[in-house]
């Protein structure tokens, strides 16, 4: 039985895929649960036009996400919070707070998959702006602005040290 998937089905296919399945699986599982429709000529025409519209919409979404990525990629966001003497936060910084501080336009949905940040310092976070567009930002958590500046200085020096090590490794492999 040939069917067109209208919802993603694990181990079978994604939306708008044309699949060939056993008659019983199609009649008893996919069709009643509205996971698929029959692959008739009329439905195939509709799917082709829908796929084209979705691809155009997807390209616009990617372009908008890349424009936002250019603005926020490798940027620093500072949070001034109360911490204990050993650098543990009283509370935590969640993905929701980070997204709110990023102030991304409402037409783009940012997604951050992290555990809540509970320690002071600089944390690297990956932000997904689209399924195909990702960028990294740095979260600077400190007790005060001066402490935040110290963390930035330490981070920049460690970054320069790693860059120097990479250059040494590249030069040694050339010799």
Swiss-Prot record:
The keyword RNA-binding applies. Pfam families: Ribosomal_L9_C, Ribosomal_L9_N. GO terms for cellular component: ribonucleoprotein complex; ribosome. Keywords: Ribonucleoprotein, Ribosomal protein, RNA-binding, rRNA-binding. One of its GO terms (molecular function) is structural constituent of ribosome. GO terms for biological process: translation. The keyword Oxidoreductase does not apply. It comes from the Bacteria. Binds to the 23S rRNA. Belongs to the bacterial ribosomal protein bL9 family. NCBIfam families: L9 (TIGR00158). This is Large ribosomal subunit protein bL9. It comes from Orientia tsutsugamushi (strain Boryong) (Rickettsia tsutsugamushi). The lineage of its organism: Bacteria, Pseudomonadati, Pseudomonadota, Alphaproteobacteria, Rickettsiales.
């Amino acid at each position: 039985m040939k069917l067109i998937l209208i919802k993603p089905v694990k181990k079978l296919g994604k939306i708008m895929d044309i699949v060939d399945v056993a008659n019983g699986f199609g009649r008893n599982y996919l069709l009643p649960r509205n996971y698929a429709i029959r692959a008739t000529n009329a439905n195939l025409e509709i799917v082709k036009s829908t796929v084209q519209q979705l691809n155009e919409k997807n390209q616009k979404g990617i372009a908008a996400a890349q424009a936002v990525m250019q603005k926020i990629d490798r940027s620093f966001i500072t949070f001034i919070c109360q911490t204990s003497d050993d650098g543990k936060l009283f509370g935590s910084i969640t993905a929701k707070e980070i997204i709110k501080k990023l102030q991304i336009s409402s037409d783009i949905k940012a997604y951050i998959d992290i555990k809540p940040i509970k320690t002071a310092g600089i944390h690297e976070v990956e932000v997904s702006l689209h399924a195909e567009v990702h960028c990294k930002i740095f979260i600077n958590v400190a007790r005060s602005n001066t402490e935040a500046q110290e963390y930035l200085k330490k981070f920049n020096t460690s970054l320069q040290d790693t860059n120097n090590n990479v250059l040494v490794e590249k030069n040694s492999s050339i010799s």
